[in-house]
């Protein structure tokens, strides 16, 4: 009898323990109790560019004399007077101040990716950029060298014509059949562009550099 009673008590204790365990609510994960941190607002790169352009416009007009010293670091690639000898690097002589200063701004912001130019532009202030632009704008650009090589590409519609001749046709009149607009509309008949930040001078520029940018 005692054995049966002991077994009954033991069985009841097990049932009570299981019932209590089932009744206890599951512990909520700690992560669920903590609210997720709000996501950082996305940065608008165009807003940064616009702000930088506004700051550039507020700087004083470029001082060519002050820019001469500041442009010394540019000489290794672009030449002392802005007439680079290597077609890998553009000629800056005679280029518009507004165009040069705006491009330096884009390099500094990384909006125009170029690791080399980023290193040079990173420490420049808007006034530095305008001064450098003014210096190169006062320099005389050297004439470029025309490529008179005939086009050999069998698939080219200009096969057999000289590169310089085809280039002049496209620059002055475009090619309506291929939806190519004339370059003169923005850069002018002589390639001098429009003073300001948007339409650079192309006259005398290295053909290789121009082709790479296009």
Which residue ranges define each predicted feature?
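Sec-dependent N-terminal signal peptides
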Residues: 5-13
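Axial heme c-ligation environment in periplasmic c-type cytochrome domains
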Residues: 85-91, 107-152, 195-201
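The feature marks the first
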Residues: 49-114, 211
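N-terminal signal peptide c-region/cleavage motif recognized by signal peptidases
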Residues: 14-19
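Cleaved targeting-peptide boundary
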Residues: 20-30
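The canonical Cys-X-X-Cys-His
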Residues: 67, 74-81, 132, 167, ...
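Sequence context surrounding c-type heme c attachment/ligation sites in exported
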Residues: 68-72, 97, 101, 172-184, ...
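Electrostatic cytochrome c docking/interface patches
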Residues: 29-71, 85-86, 146-177
């Amino acid at each position: 009898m005692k054995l049966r009673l002991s077994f009954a008590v033991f069985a009841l204790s097990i049932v009570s323990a299981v019932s209590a365990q089932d009744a206890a609510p599951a512990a909520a994960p700690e992560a669920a109790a903590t609210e997720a941190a709000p996501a950082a607002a996305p940065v608008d790169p165009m807003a940064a560019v616009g702000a930088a352009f506004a700051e550039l416009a507020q700087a004083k007009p470029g001082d060519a004399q002050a820019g001469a010293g500041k442009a010394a670091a540019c000489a290794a690639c672009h030449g002392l007077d802005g007439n680079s000898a290597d077609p890998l690097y553009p000629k800056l002589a005679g280029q518009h101040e507004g165009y040069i200063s705006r491009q330096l701004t884009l390099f500094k912001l990384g909006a125009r990716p170029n690791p080399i130019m980023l290193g040079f532009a990173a420490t420049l202030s808007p006034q530095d950029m305008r001064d450098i632009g003014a210096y190169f704008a006062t320099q005389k650009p050297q004439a470029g060298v025309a490529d008179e090589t005939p086009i050999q590409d069998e698939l080219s519609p200009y096969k057999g014509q000289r590169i310089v001749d085809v280039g002049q046709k496209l620059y002055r009149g475009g090619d309506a059949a291929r939806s190519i607009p004339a370059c003169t509309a923005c850069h002018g008949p002589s390639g001098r562009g429009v003073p300001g930040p948007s339409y650079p001078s192309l006259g005398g520029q290295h053909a290789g550099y121009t082709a790479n940018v296009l």
